[in-house]
């Protein structure tokens, strides 16, 4: 109550911020006559003047009014477009490192030019991030004349470019590209052979277009550069054939009613006891499992994983919903955007299982060479901001994870769109009949209609229904993405009907009456008369559509996220145009079936609705919204869970990448090598000669063999001890360090210090890269199995942090050990040998950098498993107790506690 009164008196925080920025707009508007009076050359010269003032110590904030006024004036001259005051407010929001929520059609691309220009003045580069290559190249070409008029350079990055082309694009003042490409270039740069091979500069400032799509929807998908792994792909086919013989439980409550239980919410499969026994029998008959072997024995866990993947592929992943088959390949369909994600693959054998199900070529699994997440990549920028039409519903997540505030920017003209109440039907059949009738009604009135669907399957089903009812229409989904811009450009014509999956066509406005510019572009060198005729015809159509009520948007079902529903609604009523929206639902829709309340179902059954009758009630709308909030909350928890796990890897990644950069930048690593050599040798001696111990506790024969084997040191330790009765530990250490130092000195003298420094650098980089790749593999294995700790009453997150730290400590130790071992053994004789080593390393890295394959991790399932196991452990991260080691710490050179007789590092402490 008190909050409401205060808000009425002083306004909300958003309103106060808008008011503050509107005052700044007055200062910008006051400068307009001054800049209008300047000629083109004087206006362009302002850029150089601003840069000089920045170098002299003036801040960007101080320059803002003049810089924005310059951009506005340049835009008027070059593009014939003047920034509105609300667009100035949007530009200030972006400059301050926030998210600007602007409704569809409010000119987000033009808003971006203000903050881009101001921040590009620093010379550190500005990245404009888009969701696909089409939008990146379109926006770059559209805005290039404006930026070049102002004396700024513009570059575009896309996959397939050479390193030189990319380097040139990043060297520009402004660089356009997709989130994937920026992220992959960051990973590739950290696999570069030399500093000169890197393409990116420092990550200074980024503006993300459709920020919700990239930072929220894409947050589950890690960026992974991977290489193929040797494996038996025929295994997937054989398991796929066996999985057909397993039957789903007819009653979820009765595990004896089938072989496995499906969990549709989490897309998981659980074998029943009956199914487990049946599967073992099938595997034995197929000679894939020994007669006395168990499916759950350690060596057969991979087999069990294959079976789970095959069952999930067959029963939970559906063609034309989760993926399509195109040109003999299984291509994932993004659940949020409805777009195909070429090159992306599900992990953990799931993609291969789907390929086996569809009978297409099975591609090999891959090994991670480098990885990060969009969440952690974009947090590397000094300043980050974004634009979207729908961010307010996710404001909490933007604030908590990225530290970004959301500002809702007022529309230039009032919104007059009418959002009708949802209509809920008992069955899907009745719902689709009602949609067809609504489409017919709106077409007869001369209104264009956009029908939004959640899947390709639904869009194609609706298309068939429309064919049966002889309704002309266009379909826009992942299968027709090439013609996307053309279809969207004419979707606003009178009576036009367009069926589109979730977000297809995002970034392109539906102009009422169609787009005359697209028609003109299709003509070869059109005359002025032809253009005028096109404009006149468009104006007539435009006026007719306005009079009929504007664009009508139909939602064929509610999405899991209210934000995606709002994006669909936002296609209508742009820039103050009239428009309307309505969602048609049924109790058979996924959202209602999996998350909706039983109360709605009971109410509808109690009402005894006739076939074709719908319910339109606030209680139903509230139930739908509650279901959506429930799903949004669950998805937020999953993304947060993933981020908390990746933060551990991210800290390690930063350390390794920083060390790698230091090695690349160094010309002389001899002092580092000497320091590492002393440390590694001291640790080796301590394993056999414990510090401050009696001579009786020494293992000199063991140390002698170890030094010969590992460090090429042939020293008669036993003889030294026998010949000198005063032989003590300090003397032993001193002599061994002298011998080892002498070995390195003689190697350097044999080839010359310069060649030795080059060789040391290549060895250091090769060991670092090899061990890091192995470490990533071990981190993957650790993360996938960590949820099981919850069932042992341990907190999986704390366990993961502890074990990841131990793995990282082992990684650093192994890197040092390997570097010294290799340098101790290898003798360089000629310069050609080092040249050849450098050539081989460069070729390997170029090959690996070329294989940038985004893997669509099945992260949701693993994150949910972790959350579930944390509940099982009975504690959360907040109340977790400090983790203490159960037994004494085992050194790398100690005997392994498993009793094998091997050293720990050659047994359970071995990383590969």
Swiss-Prot record:
<dbReference type="GO" id="GO:0006605">
    <property type="term" value="P:protein targeting"/>
</dbReference>
<feature type="binding site">
    <location>
        <position position="87"/>
    </location>
    <ligand>
        <name>ATP</name>
    </ligand>
</feature>
<keyword id="KW-0653">Protein transport</keyword>
<dbReference type="Pfam" id="PF07517">
    <property type="entry name" value="SecA_DEAD"/>
</dbReference>
<keyword id="KW-0997">Cell inner membrane</keyword>
<dbReference type="GO" id="GO:0017038">
    <property type="term" value="P:protein import"/>
</dbReference>
<feature type="binding site">
    <location>
        <position position="898"/>
    </location>
    <ligand>
        <name>Zn(2+)</name>
    </ligand>
</feature>
<dbReference type="InterPro" id="IPR036266">
    <property type="entry name" value="SecA_Wing/Scaffold_sf"/>
</dbReference>
<feature type="binding site">
    <location>
        <position position="509"/>
    </location>
    <ligand>
        <name>ATP</name>
    </ligand>
</feature>
<dbReference type="Pfam" id="PF02810">
    <property type="entry name" value="SEC-C"/>
</dbReference>
<dbReference type="InterPro" id="IPR014018">
    <property type="entry name" value="SecA_motor_DEAD"/>
</dbReference>
<feature type="compositionally biased region" description="Basic residues">
    <location>
        <begin position="902"/>
        <end position="912"/>
    </location>
</feature>
<dbReference type="InterPro" id="IPR036670">
    <property type="entry name" value="SecA_X-link_sf"/>
</dbReference>
<dbReference type="InterPro" id="IPR020937">
    <property type="entry name" value="SecA_CS"/>
</dbReference>
<feature type="region of interest" description="Disordered">
    <location>
        <begin position="847"/>
        <end position="912"/>
    </location>
</feature>
<keyword id="KW-0813">Transport</keyword>
<feature type="binding site">
    <location>
        <begin position="105"/>
        <end position="109"/>
    </location>
    <ligand>
        <name>ATP</name>
    </ligand>
</feature>
<feature type="binding site">
    <location>
        <position position="907"/>
    </location>
    <ligand>
        <name>Zn(2+)</name>
    </ligand>
</feature>
<feature type="compositionally biased region" description="Basic and acidic residues">
    <location>
        <begin position="847"/>
        <end position="859"/>
    </location>
</feature>
<keyword id="KW-0479">Metal-binding</keyword>
<keyword id="KW-1003">Cell membrane</keyword>
<comment type="subunit">
    <text>Monomer and homodimer. Part of the essential Sec protein translocation apparatus which comprises SecA, SecYEG and auxiliary proteins SecDF-YajC and YidC.</text>
</comment>
<dbReference type="InterPro" id="IPR027417">
    <property type="entry name" value="P-loop_NTPase"/>
</dbReference>
<dbReference type="InterPro" id="IPR011130">
    <property type="entry name" value="SecA_preprotein_X-link_dom"/>
</dbReference>
<dbReference type="InterPro" id="IPR014001">
    <property type="entry name" value="Helicase_ATP-bd"/>
</dbReference>
<comment type="function">
    <text>Part of the Sec protein translocase complex. Interacts with the SecYEG preprotein conducting channel. Has a central role in coupling the hydrolysis of ATP to the transfer of proteins into and across the cell membrane, serving both as a receptor for the preprotein-SecB complex and as an ATP-driven molecular motor driving the stepwise translocation of polypeptide chains across the membrane.</text>
</comment>
<dbReference type="GO" id="GO:0008564">
    <property type="term" value="F:protein-exporting ATPase activity"/>
</dbReference>
<dbReference type="GO" id="GO:0005829">
    <property type="term" value="C:cytosol"/>
</dbReference>
<dbReference type="GO" id="GO:0005524">
    <property type="term" value="F:ATP binding"/>
</dbReference>
<dbReference type="GO" id="GO:0043952">
    <property type="term" value="P:protein transport by the Sec complex"/>
</dbReference>
<keyword id="KW-0862">Zinc</keyword>
<keyword id="KW-0472">Membrane</keyword>
<dbReference type="GO" id="GO:0065002">
    <property type="term" value="P:intracellular protein transmembrane transport"/>
</dbReference>
<feature type="binding site">
    <location>
        <position position="908"/>
    </location>
    <ligand>
        <name>Zn(2+)</name>
    </ligand>
</feature>
<dbReference type="InterPro" id="IPR000185">
    <property type="entry name" value="SecA"/>
</dbReference>
<dbReference type="InterPro" id="IPR044722">
    <property type="entry name" value="SecA_SF2_C"/>
</dbReference>
<keyword id="KW-0811">Translocation</keyword>
<dbReference type="Pfam" id="PF01043">
    <property type="entry name" value="SecA_PP_bind"/>
</dbReference>
<dbReference type="Pfam" id="PF07516">
    <property type="entry name" value="SecA_SW"/>
</dbReference>
<feature type="binding site">
    <location>
        <position position="896"/>
    </location>
    <ligand>
        <name>Zn(2+)</name>
    </ligand>
</feature>
<keyword id="KW-1278">Translocase</keyword>
<feature type="compositionally biased region" description="Basic and acidic residues">
    <location>
        <begin position="881"/>
        <end position="892"/>
    </location>
</feature>
């Amino acid at each position: 109550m008190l909050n409401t009164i205060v808000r009425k008196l002083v306004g909300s925080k958003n309103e106060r911020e808008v008011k503050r920025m509107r005052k700044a707009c007055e200062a910008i508007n006051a400068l307009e006559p001054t800049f209008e009076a300047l000629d083109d050359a004087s206006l362009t010269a302002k850029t150089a003047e601003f840069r000089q003032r920045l170098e002299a110590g003036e801040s960007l904030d101080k320059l803002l009014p003049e810089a924005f006024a310059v951009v506005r004036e340049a835009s008027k001259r070059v593009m014939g477009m003047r920034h509105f005051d609300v667009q100035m407010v949007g530009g200030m929001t972006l400059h301050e490192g926030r998210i600007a929520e602007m409704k569809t059609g409010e000119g987000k691309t033009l808003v971006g030019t203000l903050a881009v220009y101001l921040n590009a003045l620093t010379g550190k580069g500005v990245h404009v991030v888009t969701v696909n290559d089409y939008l990146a190249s379109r926006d770059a070409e559209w805005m290039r004349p404006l930026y070049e008029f102002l004396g700024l350079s513009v570059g575009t990055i896309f996959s397939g470019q050479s390193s030189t082309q990319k380097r040139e694009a990043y060297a520009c003042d402004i660089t356009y590209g997709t989130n994937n490409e920026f992220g992959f270039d960051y990973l590739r740069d950290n696999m570069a052979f030399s500093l000169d091979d890197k393409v990116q500069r420092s990550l200074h400032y980024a503006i993300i277009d459709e920020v919700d799509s990239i930072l929220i929807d894409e947050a589950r998908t890690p960026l992974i550069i991977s290489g193929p792994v040797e494996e038996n792909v025929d295994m997937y086919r054989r398991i796929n054939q066996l999985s057909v013989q397993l039957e789903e439980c007819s009653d979820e409550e009765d595990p004896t009613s089938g072989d496995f239980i499906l969990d549709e919410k989490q897309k998981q499969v659980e074998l029943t006891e009956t199914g487990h026994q049946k599967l073992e029998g099938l595997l034995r008959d197929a000679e894939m499992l020994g007669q006395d072997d168990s499916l759950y024995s350690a060596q057969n866990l991979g087999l069990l994983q294959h079976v789970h993947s095959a069952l999930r592929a067959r029963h939970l992943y559906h063609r034309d919903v989760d993926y399509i088959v195109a040109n003999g390949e299984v291509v994932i369909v993004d659940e949020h955007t409805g777009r195909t994600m070429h090159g992306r693959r599900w992990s953990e054998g799931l993609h291969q299982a789907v390929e086996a199900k569809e009978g297409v070529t099975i591609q090999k699994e891959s090994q991670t060479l480098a990885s990060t997440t969009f969440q952690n990549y974009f947090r590397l920028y000094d300043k980050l901001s974004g634009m979207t039409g729908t961010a307010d519903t996710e404001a909490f997540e933007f604030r908590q994870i990225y530290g970004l505030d959301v500002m809702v920017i007022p529309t230039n003209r009032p919104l007059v769109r009418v959002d009708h109440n949802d209509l809920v039907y008992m069955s899907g059949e009745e719902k689709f009949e009602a949609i067809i009738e609504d489409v017919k009604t709106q077409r007869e009135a001369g209104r264009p209609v956009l029908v939004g669907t959640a899947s390709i399957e639904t869009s194609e089903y609706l298309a068939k229904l429309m064919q049966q009812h002889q309704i002309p229409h266009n379909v826009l989904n992942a299968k027709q993405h090439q013609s996307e811009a053309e279809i969207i450009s004419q979707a606003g014509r009178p009576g036009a009907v367009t069926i589109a999956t979730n977000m297809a066509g995002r970034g392109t406005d539906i102009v009422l009456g169609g787009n005359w510019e697209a028609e003109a572009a299709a003509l070869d060198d059109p005359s002025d008369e032809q253009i005028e005729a096109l404009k006149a015809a468009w104006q007539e159509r435009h006026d007719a559509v306005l009079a009929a009520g504007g664009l009508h948007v139909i939602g064929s079902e509610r999405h899991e996220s209210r934000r995606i529903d709002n994006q669909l609604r936002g296609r209508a009523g742009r820039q103050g145009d009239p428009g309307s929206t309505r969602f048609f639902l049924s109790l058979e829709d996924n959202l209602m079936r999996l998350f909706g309340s039983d109360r709605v179902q009971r109410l509808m059954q109690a009402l005894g609705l006739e076939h074709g009758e719908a319910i339109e009630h606030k209680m139903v709308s509230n139930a739908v919204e509650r279901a959506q909030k429930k799903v949004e909350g669950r998805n937020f928890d999953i993304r947060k869970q993933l981020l908390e796990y990746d933060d551990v890897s991210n800290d390690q990644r930063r350390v390794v990448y920083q060390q790698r950069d230091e090695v690349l930048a160094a010309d002389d690593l001899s002092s580092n090598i000497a320091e590492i050599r002393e440390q590694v040798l001291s640790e080796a001696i301590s394993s056999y000669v414990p510090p401050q111990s009696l001579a009786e506790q020494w293992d000199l024969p063991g140390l002698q063999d170890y030094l010969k084997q590992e460090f090429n040191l042939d020293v008669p330790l036993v003889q030294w001890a026998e010949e000198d009765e005063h032989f003590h530990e300090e003397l032993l250490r001193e002599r061994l360090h002298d011998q080892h130092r002498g070995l390195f000195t003689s190697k350097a003298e044999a080839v010359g210090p310069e060649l030795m420094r080059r060789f040391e650098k290549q060895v250091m980089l090769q060991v670092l890269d090899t061990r890091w790749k192995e470490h990533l593999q071990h981190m993957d294995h650790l993360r996938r199995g960590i949820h099981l700790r919850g069932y042992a009453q341990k907190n999986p997150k704390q366990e993961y942090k502890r074990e990841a730290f131990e793995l990282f400590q082992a990684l650093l130790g192994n890197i040092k050990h390997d570097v010294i071992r290799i340098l101790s053994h290898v003798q360089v004789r000629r310069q050609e040998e080092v040249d050849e080593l450098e050539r081989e390393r460069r070729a390997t890295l170029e090959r690996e950098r070329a294989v940038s394959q985004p893997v669509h991790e099945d992260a949701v399932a693993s994150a949910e498993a972790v959350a579930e196991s944390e509940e099982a452990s009975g504690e959360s991260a907040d109340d977790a107790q400090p983790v203490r080691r159960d037994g004494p710490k085992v050194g790398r050179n100690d005997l392994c506690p498993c009793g094998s007789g091997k050293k720990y590092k050659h047994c359970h402490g071995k990383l590969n």
